[in-house]
Amino acid sequence: MAASAGPEIERLIALLSKLPGLGPRSGRRAALALLKKRDTLLAPLTAALVDAQAKVRTCSVCGSLDTSDPCAICSDAARDNRLLCVVEEVGSLWAMERGGSFKGRYHVLGGLLSALDGVGPEALRVGELLGRAKGGEVSEVILALPATVDGQTTAHYLADRLAPTGVSVTMLARGVPVGGDLDWLDDGTIAQALRARRPA
């Protein structure tokens, strides 16, 4: 890891390096920045992490993260129960919410089908999705999944599984670029893609 760094610093670098988008070099830079600013950055970050670990939970309805269960979105009576938007991860849900265009409910799958990575339907929240679709309130399931091979494979699988429920199954229009991830898109692109969705 870091030459002449103590085990505590090496452990910090190793843990930071495991975060998405950070490798060993970025982890080292982040660790140094945190240690240089202990009072203004490291201490508040430590408190925020402890707070998040103690209070944040997974919503038993949609799979989002919140401090309450059900989450604020699932508890919002103003939401349209007829529309159910399926996303890969919580980050995609947050991206949809930033756009402000969608007023329905969400379902977080917790990943995508991937033969290469050995991820099958049993590893995702597919059963819960089918249960919600069969519940009687949902009339349309919107598949807001990445325009990647795994995303499209998952979308087609879900469309096949949802067909017997009788709900309309749509996908976001191709305002979402191929290979794109919702979390990286601007609000206007997400809003346009949502308006131009089509049958799956």
From Swiss-Prot:
CDD domains: TOPRIM_recR (cd01025). Coiled coil: none annotated. GO terms for biological process: DNA recombination; DNA repair. Residues 82-177 form the Toprim domain. One of its GO terms (molecular function) is DNA binding. Keywords: DNA damage, DNA recombination, DNA repair, Metal-binding, Zinc, Zinc-finger. A zinc finger (C4-type) spans 59-74. The keyword DNA damage applies. May play a role in DNA repair. It seems to be involved in an RecBC-independent recombinational process of DNA repair. It may act with RecF and RecO. Belongs to the RecR family. This is Recombination protein RecR. It comes from Caulobacter sp. (strain K31). The lineage of its organism: Bacteria, Pseudomonadati, Pseudomonadota, Alphaproteobacteria, Caulobacterales. The gene is recR.
